[in-house]
Amino acid sequence: MDDFRKQIDSIDQNIIENLSRRTEIVLKIGEIKKQDKNAVYHPAREIEIFNRIEEINKNSKFPSPVLIQIYREIISACRALEKRLCIGYFGPQATHTHQAAIHQFGSSCDFIAFRTVADVFKEVELGKVNYGVVPVENSTEGAVNHTLDMFITSSLHIYAEQYMPIHQYLLSVCPDLSSIKRIYSHPQALAQCRLWIENNLPHAELSETSSTSEAVKVCLWDKYSSAVAGRIASELHPEIKILAENIEDNPSNNTRFLVIARKDCAIRSANDKTSLLFAVKDQAGALSRVLNIFSQNNINLNKIESRPSRKKAWEYLFYVDVDGHRSDPHLREVFQAVEKETVFMKILGSYPKARITVEEIS
C-alpha cells in the first residue's frame, strides 16, 4: 500500500507542476490578448477545451462530468489571473440563476445579484459588471418575457448560452423529515414539487416567499420548517441539511440562460447560433414570406417567439434563433433578404451553442 501511495504522491506532484506550466502559458496568451484588445472570456474556446477533454477521457474510469467541473475551475482560476471578471445575475443569491452564473464562469469571479432582469441589463450597459446572466426560457413554462422584452430597446448582445436542469431540494436545520411542520418557498418552486409534497409531507403548511433564497433564510430560524430550493443554498449555508433530493415532479425540467455583454462574440465556433428580433409588415402572408426565406435557404430555426411591440396595439415582434454565425456569408445574404421583408430587424448576437450535458450540473 505504501508503494501505491508514493505513486499517487508522485502523480499529484506532476499534476501541480503541469498546472503551473499551463498557467504560465495562459498568462503569455493573456499578454497577447491585452495587446490585441481581445476579451479574456471566450466561450467558444472553453467549449472546445471541454469537448477535447471529454474525448481524451472517453476510455478512462474517471467520470467525465467531474473532470469537466475540475477544468471549469482551472480555466476560471487562470482567467482570473489575466483579469478577474465581475458577473451580474438576476438574484437573489442562492437561486438557480446564481448557480447558472457559477457554472458558466467558474467560481474565480465576483458575483453580484440584482433585483430585476432590467437591473442586470442596466449594470452591464453601464459597464459596472463585465457580463450578465439572465433566464430566457423554461422547458415547461415557456419564455421569460421580461428578458425577451429587454432586447427590444437594449444595445446589449447575447454572448453565450447555457441549459441547466432545475432540481429542487428539501432543506432544513431539522434532520428529521417527520418533524417538518412548514414548507417555505417561491410559489413556482412549490408548484414544481406539488406531488412529492402531497405524498411525503401531506400535513405540512405551505408558505410562499419572494424567492427560494428567502425561504432558506426563513427556515434558518424556524426549527421545524423546511425550504424548497436548489443545492447551492445548502452550500452557502452549512447549517442547512438536505432532507430530500430531486423532489421536482418533472425531472426533465430545465432552464435556458443567456450571458449578455456590451460586445458581440466575434469568435466563431464549430457550432454557432444567432438570435434576432424582427417585425413584419401589417399585411396578409408577411410572416410566412419571412419564414420561407429561412426554409428556402436551408436555415434551421431553433426557436420562434412572438412579443407585443409596445409601440402599437396588435403589433408584434418575433424573437428567432437560427443555426449559424452572423459572419457566415450565406447567413449574411439570408439576413439581407429578411430585412427587405421586415419593418424592423435587429441581430442580438451570434454565440456558440451550449453543451447539453445534464450530468455535469445535476
Task: Identify what each model region corresponds to.
Residues M1-S362:
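Domain-level signature for soluble enzymes in the chorismate/prephenate branch of the shikimate pathway
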